[in-house]
């Protein structure tokens, strides 16, 4: 296997967990909120896309790979999902996630796992799996995609940063060269091949801001 950079990624997200979650809470100054709305608009757009694509989740078993601070997890629980498992490599993110679902009164429907999905043995199958804001930081996606395919029975939603957008060099410099977190970008053919090779069939492929957002099904 190729050398993996996940420990480096985990340290980065652990360090910025609280600040990143403020994108969702809006607990920032007015200028910072305005900058988020402009430069990070697709963070909000991808959230809306996931909720639209998953539709009625009542009674569903869901896995959120790279769940971060639990924003998708708690919303699925509030919408009636039977159980949601969030998997993430950053302990501080998982603390935020556990606090969030507790505050929202849905903790009984949720559990969180500190792990890289590459080394995690899923205890069950899931009707729906999502990996949003995840592939940006993955050096070698194929094996993780195959693992996700192994525990997904119905729908897999994923978001991939697009190659050749104006934000690509900005993120590359800011994240990789200044903050020390590797970041990757993908073309549409690359994403389609990765998903197909892992055992998925693409149901829909959309451009959402600077992202490829893909709804796929296991085959």
What spans do the regions from the language model cover?
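A short SAM/SAH-binding and catalytic strip from SAM-dependent methyltransferases
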Residues: 128-140
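Conserved beta-strand signature within the Rossmann-like core of class I S-adenosyl-L-methionine
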Residues: 153-161
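Short, glycine-/aromatic-enriched active-site segment of Class I SAM-dependent methyltransferases
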Residues: 163-181
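Class I SAM-dependent methyltransferase SAM/SAH-binding core
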Residues: 63, 71-114
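Conserved class I S-adenosyl-L-methionine
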Residues: 1-54
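Short alpha-helix
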Residues: 182-198
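Conserved glycine-rich SAM-binding loop
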Residues: 68
């Amino acid at each position: 296997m190729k050398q993996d950079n996940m420990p480096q990624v985990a340290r980065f997200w652990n360090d910025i967990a609280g600040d990143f979650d403020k994108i969702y809470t809006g607990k920032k100054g007015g200028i910072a909120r305005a900058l988020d709305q402009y430069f990070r608009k697709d963070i909000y757009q991808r959230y809306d896309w996931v909720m639209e694509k998953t539709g009625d989740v009542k009674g569903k078993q869901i896995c959120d790979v790279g769940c971060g601070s639990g924003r998708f997890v708690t919303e699925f629980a509030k919408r009636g999902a039977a159980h949601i498992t969030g998997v993430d490599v950053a302990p501080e993110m998982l603390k935020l996630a556990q606090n969030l679902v507790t505050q929202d009164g849905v903790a009984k429907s949720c559990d969180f796992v500190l792990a890289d999905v590459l080394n995690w043995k899923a205890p069950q199958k899931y009707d729906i799996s999502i990996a949003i804001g995840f592939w940006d930081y993955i050096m070698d996606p194929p094996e993780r995609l195959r693992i996700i395919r192994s525990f997904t029975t119905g729908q897999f939603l994923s978001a991939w940063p697009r190659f050749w957008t104006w934000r690509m060099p900005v993120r590359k410099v800011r994240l990789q060269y200044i903050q020390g977190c590797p970041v990757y970008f993908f073309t549409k053919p690359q994403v389609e091949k990765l998903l197909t090779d892992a055992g998925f069939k693409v149901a829909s492929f959309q451009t959402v801001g600077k992202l490829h957002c893909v709804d796929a099904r296991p085959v």
